[in-house]
Amino acid sequence: MISRSLFNAGLFLTVIGLTPLSQAQTPSPAQSKSPRPSYSLAPYEDRLAAAQSVKVTISILGLELGSTLEQAHAKLDKLSDPAHPPKEEEEGQERKVLWQLARTDYSAVFVKSDERKRITYINAFLRPGKEIPFEKIGDTKKAPLQDVNTIVWDVLRPNRPLFRVMAKGADRKANNMTIFVVKRPGLERAAD
């Protein structure tokens, strides 16, 4: 009964032309394809080589994975909005800190750290109008996952755990960047 009412309402709106679906044109296959690198489903060896050699932004405002919370405070406290001091929270051995920033292209930075107070996760939000094109963040040909709104790079460097750089935003311009250690139980190496 309810589905019939919804169907009738949808049909009515379509007939009188009030729904965006009734006015939108069906995109051609060329328009709807998301740009995908040719190796996205490539053999493991090719993806590994890409992760080892990719050129991609691995720091935000000078912070990298493995930095200490003390280093993060030294860099971000002075950039913080005085009306919004950093917010800290502990959850087990993990620590979380949020900075609302005043004098950068970023409006906020959120980090998580491990039991050694080393950063394992960074999430940064860009201000409106300060979005960064995916191509300026990294080599899009070496990103195994991407579409028009999201791109993800795997990064593997000597003596470092596998980590991931992810950018999100409309029209291949990031308004949000996340860098994090990929946790693989039983396979993790300590980052010193």
At which residue positions do the language-model features occur?
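Bacterial N-terminal signal peptides that target proteins for export
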Residues: 1-10
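Bacterial N-terminal signal peptides
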Residues: 9-18
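Non-cytosolic coordination micro-motifs
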Residues: 25-94, 98, 115-192
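Short, compositionally biased low-complexity segments enriched in polar/charged residues
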Residues: 97-113
